[in-house]
């Protein structure tokens, strides 16, 4: 079957913050760029980012990018790569002021400068008093960011393919990535997008869990595509559980609520975070706050309600005026999903899967990496990854709030700047043969031919329940081993699942089945990685190994898809402009 071909200098898969920032940089340089998105670009999941962009602008107090770097390294539980963290914190202010000049409508201080609010894990002067470092557009910062970047991409003539679903990467005989195949959801047409550079910006995969702040589109498509192309993934055991998802709904309640002065209560009305983090209290690292809430619930101090035990987030003491100006979106979400009015009563919250710290290992320039037999990093020609799908790794074992939007903008821009130079300089990659392109259609053909078998909805439900029960906030060896065995069975069931809808136009069931393949591979890589790391670090907290073990585990974990085995990869402790921050005990 010969596919129609569309040819571009670069194809960017995913139109969230990172994908649109990379595409913008490529288009501005005069290269041709295709931007593929399975939803309309401003519906990408970046739209749900609420609190802000953490960056050392120094608008509310004296600030310094090195203080921001210290907090990020500490937050990562010391497995964030310090060269990448340094680059992000140092170039952050420049990248954010560029957004301001593009027209991003930030909230303002009285003197007209960008408003910055306190967020968890932030400090002045290397661990001193609480800092206010998160630049915000009320509590709709992601929404403002997406609209700004979308307008700029239109202005710079990026070719946008809206509601196109990327199927798989296409590799040539040399192992270089030379584009991808994609399905037009509207017509059912399949096209080969041929490109000299392919940028994965597909976002997270929170839908492997039952309870998540992530939209239904966050199905790990980039992880699945990478693994099927033989690309390893790093630190997949590291999943952030946001302390405050609305109980029963999973909808995110921004950390900005606590930054503005909100606090958590147990059923006795006690501010319990004072016991777990005496200094930072409710603004400790997210992993610390999430574990504290779960301990309160396990020990019987959770609040009761129709959605099961939970904590309460109190905001009413801030007053109606502050809430309406600083947190208007939270008022709306709480009234809709929790049926409470935060102006009068607290919001019921529970830790909820939020962010994938792991992903495709990359350089600061977004170039995807694999590891050779000697354990050395090797660049994969033609493949880039930016945003949540990438593991640069600036977040290590625990991301700080507000650093995700900074990651999107800084590394989307960095990949674009690199491609600006390299596309012009590099020779032409060898074309993929017809059989290379056809290889990327195997999954689509399998689903199209499977008319009998199990209902994929039941399989997805089993997958999500397995992950929620065995790989959540607290983990334990026996449960995780059992969970991995269950996933092996679910994986076999998936091979014989059926597709009922045979239509070509707007066949959403077909897309959901293809997404399920990606959820499966992401969940499996997570389970293998979580069983491998025998310590507690950041978001990976094990009852059977409660301590951090720097002697054996101050490293990244790498899942190799060909052998389904694990290896270690060293953490970069060599920033270029200042001495490294050595590992120490992490307290808040």
UniProtKB/Swiss-Prot annotation:
It is found in: Cell inner membrane. It comes from Salmonella typhimurium (strain LT2 / SGSC1412 / ATCC 700720). This is Succinate dehydrogenase flavoprotein subunit. The lineage of its organism: Bacteria, Pseudomonadati, Pseudomonadota, Gammaproteobacteria, Enterobacterales. GO terms for biological process: anaerobic respiration; electron transport chain; tricarboxylic acid cycle. InterPro entries: FAD-dep_OxRdtase_2_FAD-bd (IPR003953), FAD/NAD-bd_sf (IPR036188), FRD_SDH_FAD_BS (IPR003952), Fum_R/Succ_DH_flav-like_C_sf (IPR037099), Fum_Rdtase/Succ_DH_flav-like_C (IPR015939), SdhA/FrdA/AprA (IPR030664), Succ_DH/fumarate_Rdtase_cat_sf (IPR027477), Succ_DH_flav_su_fwd (IPR011281). It comes from the Bacteria. Its EC number is 1.3.5.1. The keyword Transmembrane does not apply. Two distinct, membrane-bound, FAD-containing enzymes are responsible for the catalysis of fumarate and succinate interconversion; the fumarate reductase is used in anaerobic growth, and the succinate dehydrogenase is used in aerobic growth. Pfam families: FAD_binding_2 (PF00890), Succ_DH_flav_C (PF02910). Belongs to the FAD-dependent oxidoreductase 2 family. FRD/SDH subfamily. Keywords: Cell inner membrane, Cell membrane, Electron transport, FAD, Flavoprotein, Membrane, Oxidoreductase, Transport, Tricarboxylic acid cycle. The gene is sdhA. Pathway: Carbohydrate metabolism; tricarboxylic acid cycle; fumarate from succinate (bacterial route): step 1/1.
């Amino acid at each position: 079957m010969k596919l129609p071909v569309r040819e571009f200098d670069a194809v960017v898969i995913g139109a969230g913050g990172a994908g649109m920032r990379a595409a913008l940089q490529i288009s501005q340089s005069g290269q041709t760029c295709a931007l593929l998105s399975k939803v309309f670009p401003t519906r990408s999941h970046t739209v749900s980012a609420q609190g802000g962009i953490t960056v050392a602008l120094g608008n509310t107090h004296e600030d310094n990018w090195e203080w921001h770097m210290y907090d990020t390294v500490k937050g990562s539980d010391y497995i964030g790569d310090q060269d990448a963290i340094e680059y992000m914190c140092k170039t952050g202010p420049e990248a954010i002021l560029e957004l301001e000049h593009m027209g991003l409508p930030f909230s303002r201080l009285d003197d007209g400068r960008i408003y910055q609010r306190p967020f968890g894990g932030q400090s002045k002067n290397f661990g001193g008093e609480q800092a206010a470092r998160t630049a915000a557009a009320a509590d709709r910062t992601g929404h403002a960011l997406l609209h700004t970047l979308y307008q700029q991409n239109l202005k710079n003539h990026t070719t946008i393919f809206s509601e196109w679903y990327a199927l798989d990467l296409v590799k040539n005989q040399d192992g270089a990535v030379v584009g991808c195949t994609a399905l037009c959801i509207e017509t059912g047409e399949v096209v080969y997008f041929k490109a000299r550079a392919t940028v994965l910006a597909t976002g997270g995969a929170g839908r492997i869990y039952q309870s998540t702040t992530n939209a239904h589109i966050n199905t790990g498509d980039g992880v699945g595509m990478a693994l099927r192309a033989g690309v390893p993934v790093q630190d997949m055991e590291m999943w952030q559980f946001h302390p405050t998802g609305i109980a029963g709904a999973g909808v995110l309640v921004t950390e900005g609520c606590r930054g503005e002065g909100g606090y958590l209560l147990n059923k006795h009305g006690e501010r319990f975070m004072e016991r777990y983090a005496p200094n930072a209290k409710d603004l400790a690292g997210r992993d610390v706050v999430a574990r504290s809430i779960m301990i309160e619930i396990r020990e019987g101090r959770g609040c009761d309600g129709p959605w099961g035990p939970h904590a309460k987030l109190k905001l009413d003491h801030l007053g109606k005026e502050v809430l309406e100006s600083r947190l208007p979106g939270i008022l709306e979400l709480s009234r809709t999903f929790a049926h409470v009015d935060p102006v009068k009563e607290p919001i019921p919250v529970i830790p909820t899967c939020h962010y994938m710290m792991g992903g495709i290992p990359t350089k600061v320039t977004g170039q995807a990496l694999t590891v050779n037999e000697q354990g050395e990093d090797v660049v994969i020609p033609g493949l880039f990854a930016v945003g949540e799908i990438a593991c640069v790794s600036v977040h290590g074992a625990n991301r700080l709030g507000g650093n995700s939007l900074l990651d999107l903008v800084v590394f989307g821009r960095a990949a674009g700047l690199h491609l600006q130079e390299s596309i012009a300089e590099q020779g032409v990659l060898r074309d993929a043969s017809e059989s290379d392109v056809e290889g990327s259609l195997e999954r689509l053909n399998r689903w199209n031919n499977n008319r009998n078998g199990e209902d994929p909805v039941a399989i997805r439900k089993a997958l999500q329940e397995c992950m929620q029960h065995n790989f959540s906030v607290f983990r334990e060896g026996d449960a995780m081993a059992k969970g991995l065995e269950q996933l092996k069975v679910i994986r076999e069931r998936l091979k014989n699942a059926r597709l009922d809808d045979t239509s070509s136009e707007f066949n959403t069931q077909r897309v959901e089945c293809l997404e399920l393949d990606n959820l499966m591979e992401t969940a499996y890589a997570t389970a293998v990685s979580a069983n491998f790391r025998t310590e507690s670090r950041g978001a990976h907290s094990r009852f059977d190994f409660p301590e951090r073990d720097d002697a054996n585990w101050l490293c990244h974990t790498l899942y190799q898809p060909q052998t389904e085995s694990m290896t270690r990869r060293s953490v970069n402790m060599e920033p270029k402009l200042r001495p490294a921050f050595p590992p120490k005990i992490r307290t808040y």
